[in-house]
Amino acid sequence: DGAQFWTPYGATECLPVAVIEGRELQSTRNATEQGAGTCVGRAVAPNLVRIIGIDDAAIAQWSDDRMVADGVVGEITVAGPTATDSYFNRDAATHAAKIREVLADGSERIVHRMGDVGYFDAEGRLWFCGRKTQRVETASGPLYTEQVEPVFNTHPDVKRTALVGVGMPGQQRPVLCYELQPGVPESRRTEVVEALRAIASRNTHMAAIDAFLCHPAFPVDIRHNAKIGREKLAVWAAR
């Protein structure tokens, strides 16, 4: 009973960024299933984790004016000894993901853009809301995968879901793709869709989701089965 299990959050370019103990993670599960995102814990010192407004363009120079308030979803950035300064022989990638910051003493450091979106809660915990490139930009505002999919994943007949956008950013139609659990007959698809539609109607920020498509097997990263190929699913959903 006294054992502790810590789960890190990070990336190849910076690991770890934050950590969370198993019991705390379990205690946040209800919030995750209600659309809060996934709590990944507190930043690992001496890393400095800050949230900036979402911007798809490169950012050459750091400015504190870009930072957003606690509770506001933005892009996660990290500065610290575990963050890389550049990509080897990949200048375009370095330009897109690295920000140069001038400190008060005149020295400089590199800030890494995680490419993930999230926010800090009132307790200083970091919440992961998905990949920046996989957000869905609707006419009524953005939807983030990790604030949507876990809510629908609570349906017992659903194995997993994937939120994708069809159309131009700013006017995208949100589409929820889903896989049925093994053994669930195809004849239940209509019933499942009605249940998913009811879930959407109970959550204000998901009310715009009115398209539900059953997919036989999501495309995934061959290295990480949990990484769903939402870009490929979006092409499929648009057909």
What are these regions (language model features)?
Residues 162-167, 175-176, 197-239:
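Conserved C-terminal "lid"/linker of ANL adenylate-forming enzymes
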Residues 42-46, 54-102, 141-143:
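Conserved ATP/PPi-binding loop(s) of AMP-dependent carboxylate-activating enzymes
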Residues 80, 85-86, 95-96, 102-205:
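AMP-binding/adenylate-forming catalytic core of the ANL superfamily
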Residues 10, 41, 116:
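Active-site glycine-centered loops adjacent to acidic/histidine catalytic or metal-binding residues
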Residues 48, 55-56, 64, 103, ...:
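Residue-level recognition of short loop/turn positions
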Residues 59, 68, 121, 127, ...:
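Generic structural signal for well-ordered beta-strand positions
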Residues 34-43, 66-67, 108-110:
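Short Gly/Pro-enriched turn/cap motifs at secondary-structure boundaries
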Residues 1-35, 48:
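Gly/Ser/Thr-rich phosphate-binding loop
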